[in-house]
Amino acid sequence: MATALSEEELDNEDYYSLLNVRREASSEELKAAYRRLCMLYHPDKHRDPELKSQAERLFNLVHQAYEVLSDPQTRAIYDIYGKRGLEMEGWEVVERRRTPAEIREEFERLQREREERRLQQRTNPKGTISVGVDATDLFDRYDEEYEDVSGSSFPQIEINKMHISQSIEAPLTATDTAILSGSLSTQNGNGGGSINFALRRVTSAKGWGELEFGAGDLQGPLFGLKLFRNLTPRCFVTTNCALQFSSRGIRPGLTTVLARNLDKNTVGYLQWRWGIQSAMNTSIVRDTKTSHFTVALQLGIPHSFALISYQHKFQDDDQTRVKGSLKAGFFGTVVEYGAERKISRHSVLGAAVSVGVPQGVSLKVKLNRASQTYFFPIHLTDQLLPSAMFYATVGPLVVYFAMHRLIIKPYLRAQKEKELEKQRESAATDVLQKKQEAESAVRLMQESVRRIIEAEESRMGLIIVNAWYGKFVNDKSRKSEKVKVIDVTVPLQCLVKDSKLILTEASKAGLPGFYDPCVGEEKNLKVLYQFRGVLHQVMVLDSEALRIPKQSHRIDTDG
């Protein structure tokens, strides 16, 4: 199965893999690995001009890796940000002997400065499209005396309301942001719209303020003020003041929310709303890696209710979530259950069934695509009909699994293969260069490998008979795919010391004499070796550690 190909996979040298040391290697381990490779690649050991040139280039690369990893500061930068972090401008002004945490903060500061130039042109578009569907005719049929009316034999499904909203942000300075938003709504043939403009200023690291002006065709001008402030590291408060002008006069409104972190995963909220729909609300929200739990109680005019909801988060690649809630108040009782799942890199599809009195049964379908939301509330019936509940539950599941198998999965697979092929084409030059470097390294190893084999044979030690690296395919696959495996017998034999071979938990593509023959795909290392005159065989994943010889690798020839 193909894996995502990152830029770092193409641009960054793995210095740990090059030296074949652990990421936690001590200075002594680094020095020993450096000396061994220096003896192998030192230009003075080769007389042939071509080999001497190749050795000089590899020697410089090994020296660069050792220089980076032997210095605590550059090593910390490399561990956190890779080779690109070392190339970031501004490190020359950083004081020496900083901790990794301080280096991380400094890097982020430099990165923010670089991004400020792009800030002026950056927006944060957000949009919502809601389409209300009246499908009650599917379940709430008229009496038989009306069935003779022309066209009544087919249920009528209507769109009875729509809502569209959009907003964009325009950063003016590092602390000021302008926000423009608008919305249009229509219900049963009547509609209206509004437009709002807001200016937000970050006053300090602890707070910000926002001024808002709005106008619409159904309501008069709106003036608002929002304030946010961190009172303590665990407590914050927000206040929203609004003045709504209409033909009936001025309608003031005030909303204040006080929140406090009760523990690492739990937040308590206390909300007071005065003026427009006055109410007092308190809630506790607990959010963990595997669950999201909410309990709330509201006393207000005209609505008072109690709410409890729970959401379970599955730890799968599709980020599947199932949820359920119970809401009871003066308006009635509503039970809601549903699920959502990631269907692509930027899209999440969800569906929920709402069953309540006196609302009836509704199906709510929601699609989040990046920062855009598409919402489809479908009203099925005003009554509590088991048939409506059944179809609202089973219908979306059947449609989803059918679409996922017949449309979504094939489309994503085709897109992934297309993207992978494009990445392979763009990486072709880099792969060719890595291949030439690996071949040069193998030529430089020949003399050392000959001496190692002689020493190992004299004591019946470790001899690498054959070694292959890359993507292994079965016999049914196309023969052309077999070129994705390369012979790495010589490079592995060169790493043998005292009848032992130890490879760390890093991609083998960075080892001397190796290269990546199948960029972006899963790879394995297969080794056939001889120890004490007995054949052994082992296969490991690309980033899996390997230590040979081992008794468990022995090939049983008795049977």
Curated annotation (Swiss-Prot):
* Oligomeric and partner information: Associates with the mitochondrial contact site and cristae organizing system (MICOS) complex, composed of at least MICOS10/MIC10, CHCHD3/MIC19, CHCHD6/MIC25, APOOL/MIC27, IMMT/MIC60, APOO/MIC23/MIC26 and QIL1/MIC13. This complex was also known under the names MINOS or MitOS complex. The MICOS complex associates with mitochondrial outer membrane proteins SAMM50, MTX1 and MTX2 (together described as components of the mitochondrial outer membrane sorting assembly machinery (SAM) complex) and DNAJC11, mitochondrial inner membrane protein TMEM11 and with HSPA9.
The gene is: DNAJC11
List the protein's name: DnaJ homolog subfamily C member 11
Q: Which InterPro entries match?
A: DnaJ-like_C11_C, DnaJ_domain, DnaJ_domain_CS, DNAJC11-like_beta-barrel, J_dom_sf, Mito_inner_membrane_organizer
Q: Which residues form the J domain?
A: 14-82
**Superkingdom classification of source:** Eukaryota
| Xref: SUPFAM superfamilies | Chaperone J-domain
The family assignment reads: Belongs to the DNAJC11 family.
Q: Which GO terms describe its cellular component?
A: MIB complex; mitochondrial outer membrane; mitochondrion; nuclear speck; nucleoplasm; SAM complex
Kindly list the places in or outside the cell where this protein is found, as annotated in its UniProt entry: Mitochondrion
- Residues that the record marks as modified (Phosphoserine) are 204
* GO biological process terms held by the UniProt record: cristae formation; inner mitochondrial membrane organization
Q: Which UniProt keywords apply?
A: Acetylation, Chaperone, Coiled coil, Membrane, Mitochondrion, Mitochondrion outer membrane, Phosphoprotein
